[in-house]
């Protein structure tokens, strides 16, 4: 066995802020203990980025901003969100946004008998404010050395666009931002060995770059 997905989830201890001293110490203890046992971490709902990954590179990636999951129970992330993150959150290090949803209208999910309503904002109108092309481009734009195909398996089976995920190499050794403006658009190219990957995205305004 080369890898195991495990972890824990739970509420905050009473009286403690998510980014307060209690949780910062807990977070650091988790990172140090994982390093001791040669365990890589992909953390969701982390504390603010502090540069700890420079000391403990086993802290491979983290969420730390509104990720893809936000689209499941709200009006969703607006189109400009994806082209703001490279200029804000991603300056602090890799982000596990979990891009790559193919069923952007949730047509299969809405008809599922197992669907669970999270809150009043989670309605039949929920969708991802994106295109399929942008979902694929975000694998390049929103850098993370560990990427996952976050949609249901049924939405990938037989889909020709899934070939990009098969070909993609997240272990990039060179990156360059070719063009962009915060919240407007971004164009990023990355190299992994002899492979080059280019991702470009815009907000809700059409444009040529």
Give residue spans per PLM region.
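Short, well-ordered loop/turn elements at secondary-structure boundaries
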Residues: 36, 142-143, 192-194
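Aromatic- and carboxylate-enriched substrate-binding clefts and catalytic-loop regions
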Residues: 1-122
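Flexible loop/turn segments at secondary-structure boundaries
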Residues: 11-15, 48-53, 104-106, 148-150, ...
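Carbohydrate-binding surface patches
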Residues: 182-209
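Conserved, mostly hydrophobic/aromatic
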Residues: 41, 141, 198
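Catalytic cores of secreted or luminal carbohydrate-active enzymes
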Residues: 133-181
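Structural motif
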Residues: 124-135
